[in-house]
């Protein structure tokens, strides 16, 4: 009686399923050392990242949403930028802008990248900014690029947006446009610990 053995191999640059699962458990455990008592929150957020998607975290201030995102960035060792959304934040504050510089005796415009140019971007309190500013994330989240002055600038992979928002009942918040909500794989409600 011959038994055939099936081995699972991964393509170059990819982990085998067993190794992937072990790596995911390791990341979850490491994040869990800092974010204590919020296992479901950690797991749901990491699920979004492992699915190569963006996640929206909703909860009142002080529940550790920002700490969670910073910890994930540290654990997975990626470039990280935080954007604090406020009513006076402008789209160029996120995407970047062309600045006029003197070079070789001439004035030229040079692109100055904004904080969206990172592997993991924390859009903190995203619903405190105006809809116009919120919409500056749309192209980046959907197409992994930014267009400024008719020039396209690709975002380095991997690219994830983890956004936090306060409940709409709180003063000074704006609802996220439907097009913005569609860019997130899911919204995680952050409970009290």
Name the predicted role of every residue range.
Residues 17-63:
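Pre-Walker A (pre-P-loop) alpha-helix and adjacent loop at the N terminus of AAA/AAA+ ATPase modules
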Residues 44-47, 100-122:
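Conserved alpha-helical scaffold flanking the Walker A/P-loop in AAA+ ATPase domains
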Residues 59, 124-125, 136:
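Walker B catalytic acidic pair
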Residues 60, 94, 164:
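P-loop (Walker A) phosphate-binding loop of NTP-binding proteins
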Residues 101-106, 129-133, 141-193:
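Canonical AAA+ ATPase core
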């Amino acid at each position: 009686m011959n038994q055939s053995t099936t081995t699972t191999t991964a393509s170059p640059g990819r982990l085998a399923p067993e190794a992937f699962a072990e790596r995911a458990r390791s990341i979850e455990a490491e994040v869990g050392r800092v974010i204590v008592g919020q296992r479901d929150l950690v797991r749901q957020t990491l699920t979004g990242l492992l699915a190569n998607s963006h996640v929206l975290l909703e909860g009142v201030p002080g529940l550790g949403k920002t700490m969670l995102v910073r910890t994930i960035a540290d654990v997975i060792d990626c470039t990280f930028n935080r954007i604090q959304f406020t009513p006076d934040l402008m789209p160029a504050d996120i995407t970047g802008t062309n600045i006029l510089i003197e070079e070789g005796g001439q004035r030229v415009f040079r692109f100055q990248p904004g904080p969206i140019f990172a592997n993991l971007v924390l859009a903190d309190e995203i619903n405190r900014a105006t809809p116009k500013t919120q919409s500056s994330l749309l192209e980046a989240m959907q197409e992994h690029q930014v267009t400024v002055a008719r020039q396209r600038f690709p975002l380095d992979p991997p690219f994830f947006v983890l956004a936090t928002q306060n409940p709409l009942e709180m003063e000074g918040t704006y609802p996220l446009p439907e097009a913005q909500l569609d860019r997130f794989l899911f919204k995680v409600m952050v409970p009290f610990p």
